[in-house]
Amino acid sequence: KLGIAVPEKEKTKAELEREKQAKQVIAANELATRFFQACLTKTDYGIKAQDYLAGRGITPEIIERFSIGVALPNYNALLSALGKRGCSVGLLVQAGLAVNYDRGPMDKFRGRVMIPIQDPRGHVVGFGGRILEQNAQQTAKYMNTGETEWFNKRTLLFGMNVALKEIKKRHQAVIVEGYMDAISLHACGIDWAVASMGTAFAQEQAKLLARAADEVVFSYDSDAAGQRATVRAVSIAKEAGLKVRVLVVPDGKDPDEFVRKHGKDAYLQLIATAVSG
């Protein structure tokens, strides 16, 4: 108040090194995002991904809003493209974009629709990838960046940076499990939805929401795991001072399936009749 500058605590060498690493990883992730977007719009394989997205009701506007792209099925498309932009193999491994195998490094994400995951400031800190074609090896349907210092799911809510304005306006957030659920809700106009990315809703996520909303509506999957997760999530959200309601999607469907089948108004009706947690 008196204009006296408080000296900042000197950062240790280790802290400075961590900051530098985080900046490099985020820069690599931003480059990867742009590469995946280019693959979606400028390759034959991208047309497959566009057809898949269109089939799920995801419009070009939503693709743009969430910076959705596609990872080519080749073993080193990203490694090669980002290598030319000055990203070392070590950096791409550290960022979780490449994996070192005995045969050499390979892209971690291959043949997947790519969804960048941003922190509240809009930095890309990781990715979710949804398989485009189930193959004989039955690779996992979803693959995420592994947990690191800068990609800690407890401190992130998927879609928060794009939903924030609408959440503040409505004083309410709708919380779903997966990023595809959140994207489908945005696609039909429920653009105050965010995803906790899995069923374990965390205190850090509740605090993030409490800064923007008064009330949260949990819309987890109707299966047993989703119901158990809802019970835990309700108490965590209440501890953060949030009003809580629970939305049950009929017919055991997840929000993504329901909203694609029945549309926005039917889902708004479910929000309106959601019971207090």
Regions found by a protein language model. Give the residues of each.
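Conserved P-loop/Walker A NTP-binding site and adjacent catalytic elements of P-loop NTPases
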Residues: 1
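Non-catalytic interaction/clamp surfaces of large macromolecular machines
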Residues: 20-64
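C-terminal or mid-to-C-terminal helical accessory/interaction module adjacent to the motor/catalytic core
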Residues: 241-277
